C-alpha cells in the first residue's frame, strides 16, 4: 500500500499490472528526470498501452499543478499554482548572481497556526498537500529548464504538520527521481517537536530551520500560539538532541519586528538561550530577517541600523549570526508574505 501512495509508486505498479518488464519504469523516470518530458504521450520509447494508461490515470501532464499567475522581480519569481480540486498555493524561485537557483515551496494550502506576523496564517488552513503536489511544484520549475540547486520548505504551511512531508522528501532524495542530496533541502518549522524528532531519525542530513522570533516564553506564545503546545524550552532541548545526533547546524530564524522583539533585552535573552547549552552550541546560527510588511498584519519594518546593532550584540557574545539578504519583497514573495493575493 505504501509503495503505491505516490504517483511514482503507482507508475511502478502500472508497469507490473501491464506485465511489462521492470526496465519500462526506468525508461519512464529517465524520460521525466533526464529528458524533462512533461507530456506522457511524448515519451515515445514507452509502449502505447502504457502511455494510454498513464494519461488515463494522471492526465496528459506529469506535473499536476497548473500555473495561473506569475510575478517577477530582478532575482525572484513567484508562481500561483492551481491544484486539481481548485485550491491554490504559491511557490517562489530565487536566482543568485553565481547562477545558483533556490526554490521555496509550500506544504499546505494556507496555515492554521496563526502566527501574528505571517500573512499566510490569515488565510486559514484548508488542507495538507499530497507528496505529489509538494514535489510537482518543483517539477514545474524543472520542466521549464531551471536547475534545482536547493529547496526550502518555507512556503505556505507548517511542513511538520503534514504527514505527507516525509514521503515528499523521500521522492526528492530518490536517486532514480529528483536525486537531490539531503543537504540541499531545508525544512523550516515553528517548533513541532514530533516532526523534528522524526526528521532526526529519517533524514539526519536535511537542514533544519527553527522559527524563534522571541526568546521569552510569554511573548512567543502571544506571537506564535504553537508555543503553548510546544514550549520554547522543550523545543530547544529537542534541537540539542538533533544536533548531537546529526552533527549538523541548526538555523534559527528571527524576524525583526520594530518595537516588539528588537530591544537590547531581547538580544541578550537570545544570547542566554544559546550559550552554555553544551559543546555543540556553536552549531546554532541566528538568521536575522527584516520584517516584510503585508496588508494582513500591523507590524512595522525595522531599520537596517537597528538590525545590525542586534546582530552585533549577538556576535560580541560569540553567537554565530547574519542578517538575511531579502529577495522578492517587492512582489510579496519574501518570508511571511505568501497569501494567495493574486487570486482575488
Curated annotation (Swiss-Prot):
Swiss-Prot/TrEMBL cofactor(s): [4Fe-4S] cluster
Catalysed reactions, as listed in the record: adenosine(2503) in 23S rRNA + 2 reduced [2Fe-2S]-[ferredoxin] + 2 S-adenosyl-L-methionine = 8-methyladenosine(2503) in 23S rRNA + 5'-deoxyadenosine + L-methionine + 2 oxidized [2Fe-2S]-[ferredoxin] + S-adenosyl-L-homocysteine
Any Gene Ontology biological process: rRNA base methylation
Pfam families: Radical_SAM (PF04055)
The protein's enzyme class: transferase
Keyword annotations of the record: 4Fe-4S, Antibiotic resistance, Cytoplasm, Disulfide bond, Iron, Iron-sulfur, Metal-binding, Methyltransferase, rRNA processing, S-adenosyl-L-methionine, Transferase
Catalytic residues (positions): 90 (proton acceptor), 335 (s-methylcysteine intermediate)
Residues that coordinate or bind S-adenosyl-L-methionine: 157-158, 188, 211-213, 292
GO cellular component, one term: cytoplasm
Disulfide bridge partners, by residue number: 104-335
Every Radical SAM core domain range: 97-330
Signal peptide limits: none
Cofactor annotation comment: Binds 1 [4Fe-4S] cluster. The cluster is coordinated with 3 cysteines and an exchangeable S-adenosyl-L-methionine.
Any GO MF annotation of the entry: rRNA (adenine) methyltransferase activity
Keyword Metal-binding: yes
E.C. no: 2.1.1.224
Location(s) in or outside the cell: Cytoplasm
Residues the entry annotates as binding [4Fe-4S] cluster: 111, 115, 118
Family, as annotated: Belongs to the radical SAM superfamily. RlmN family. Cfr subfamily.
Additional notes on this entry: Reaction proceeds by a ping-pong mechanism involving intermediate methylation of a conserved cysteine residue.
Cited PANTHER family: 23S RRNA METHYLTRANSFERASE, RADICAL SAM CORE DOMAIN-CONTAINING PROTEIN
Record function comment: Specifically methylates position 8 of adenine 2503 in 23S rRNA. Confers resistance to some classes of antibiotics.
Protein name: Ribosomal RNA large subunit methyltransferase Cfr
Organism: Clostridium botulinum (strain Loch Maree / Type A3)
Gene that this polypeptide is encoded by: cfr
Amino acid at each position: 500500500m505504501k509503495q503505491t501512495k505516490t504517483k511514482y509508486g503507482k507508475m511502478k505498479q502500472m508497469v507490473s499490472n501491464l506485465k511489462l518488464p521492470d526496465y519500462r519504469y526506468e525508461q519512464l523516470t529517465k524520460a521525466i528526470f533526464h529528458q524533462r518530458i512533461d507530456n506522457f504521450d511524448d515519451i515515445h520509447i514507452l509502449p502505447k498501452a502504457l502511455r494510454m494508461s498513464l494519461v488515463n490515470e494522471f492526465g496528459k501532464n506529469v506535473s499536476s499543478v497548473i500555473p495561473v499567475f506569475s510575478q517577477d522581480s530582478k532575482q525572484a519569481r513567484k508562481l500561483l499554482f492551481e491544484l486539481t480540486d481548485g485550491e491554490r498555493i504559491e511557490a517562489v524561485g530565487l536566482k543568485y548572481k553565481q547562477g545558483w537557483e533556490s526554490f521555496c515551496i509550500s506544504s499546505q494550502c494556507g496555515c492554521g497556526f496563526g502566527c501574528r506576523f505571517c500573512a499566510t496564517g490569515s488565510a486559514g488552513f484548508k488542507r495538507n498537500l499530497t507528496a505529489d503536489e509538494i514535489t510537482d511544484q518543483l517539477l514545474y520549475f524543472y520542466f521549464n529548464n531551471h536547475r534545482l540547486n536547493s529547496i526550502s520548505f518555507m512556503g505556505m504551511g507548517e511542513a511538520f504538520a503534514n504527514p505527507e512531508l516525509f514521503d515528499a522528501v523521500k521522492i526528492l532524495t530518490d536517486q532514480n527521481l529528483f536525486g537531490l542530496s539531503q543537504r540541499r533541502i531545508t525544512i523550516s518549522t515553528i517548533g513541532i517537536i514530533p516532526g523534528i524528532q522524526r526528521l532526526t531519525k529519517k533524514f539526519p542530513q536535511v537542514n533544519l530551520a527553527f522559527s524563534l522570533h522571541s526568546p521569552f516564553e510569554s511573548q512567543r506564545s502571544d506571537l506564535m500560539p504553537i508555543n503553548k503546545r510546544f514550549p520554547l524550552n522543550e523545543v530547544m532541548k529537542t534541537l540539542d538532541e538533533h544536533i548531537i545526533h546529526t552533527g549538523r547546524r541548526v538555523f534559527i530564524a528571527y524576524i525583526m519586528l520594530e518595537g516588539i522583539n528588537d530591544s537590547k533585552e531581547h538580544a541578550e535573552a537570545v544570547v542566554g538561550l544559546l550559550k552554555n547549552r553544551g559543546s555543540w552550541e556553536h552549531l546554532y546560527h541566528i538568521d536575522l530577517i527584516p520584517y516584510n510588511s503585508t496588508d494582513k498584519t500591523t507590524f512595522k519594518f525595522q531599520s537596517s541600523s537597528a538590525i545590525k546593532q542586534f546582530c552585533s550584540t549577538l556576535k560580541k557574545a560569540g553567537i554565530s549570526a547574519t542578517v538575511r539578504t531579502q529577495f522578492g519583497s517587492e512582489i510579496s514573495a519574501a518570508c511571511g508574505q505568501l497569501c494567495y493575493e493574486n487570486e482575488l
